[in-house]
């Protein structure tokens, strides 16, 4: 129903990544992939951009950098499924949200990930490299993280900037940190 509503309303992009439901939410695998296939078909008809949300693993994992290979595999599965269903490659936007945040060494871990993602998936669009922050993080830490994320986006390029919803309200919406990073 959401895909139909978004298409009717002219929404230009939406998340659609069934593997997240299976891997992190323990939702029935068959239901997740059948629902996703139906949604993707409608999104293809409406020429809506698919924003791949494999980055959600980063928000969920305790040691997020350990899921880096898993993120690449998730992107591969979801992108290929989308293409097989009919979404054009230029409408598939991979989330480049980095697999690490402080106190890990940001550029040392995140720049190679950003480069690998672009090397492996060069026919898709790249969504800006921004990490979400938890409610208890300091304003300075969030701003510094976003400055470093912005630097990586500028060094590696990003095609779109999209908003993300807080994961169960645990993350502070990050628009203000983007603005402070640009300042």
Regions found by a protein language model. Name each.
Residues 1-183:
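Anaerobic metallocofactor- and corrinoid-dependent redox/one-carbon enzyme cores
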């Amino acid at each position: 129903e959401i895909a139909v509503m978004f298409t009717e309303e002219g929404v230009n992009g939406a998340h659609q990544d069934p593997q997240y439901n299976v891997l992190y939410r323990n939702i029935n695998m068959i239901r997740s992939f059948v629902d996703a296939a139906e949604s993707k078909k409608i999104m293809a008809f409406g020429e809506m951009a698919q924003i791949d949300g494999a980055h959600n693993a980063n928000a969920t994992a305790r040691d997020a950098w350990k899921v880096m290979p898993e993120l690449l595999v998730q992107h591969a599965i979801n992108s290929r499924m989308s293409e097989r269903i009919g979404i054009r490659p230029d409408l598939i936007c991979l989330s480049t949200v980095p697999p690490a945040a402080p106190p890990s060494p940001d550029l040392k871990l995140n720049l190679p990930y950003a480069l690998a993602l672009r090397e492996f998936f060069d026919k898709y669009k790249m969504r800006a490299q921004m990490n979400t922050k938890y409610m208890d993080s300091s304003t300075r830490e969030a701003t510094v993280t976003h400055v470093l994320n912005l630097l990586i986006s500028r060094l590696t390029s990003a095609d779109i900037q999209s908003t993300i919803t807080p994961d169960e309200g645990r993350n502070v919406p990050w628009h203000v940190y983007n603005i402070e990073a640009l300042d």
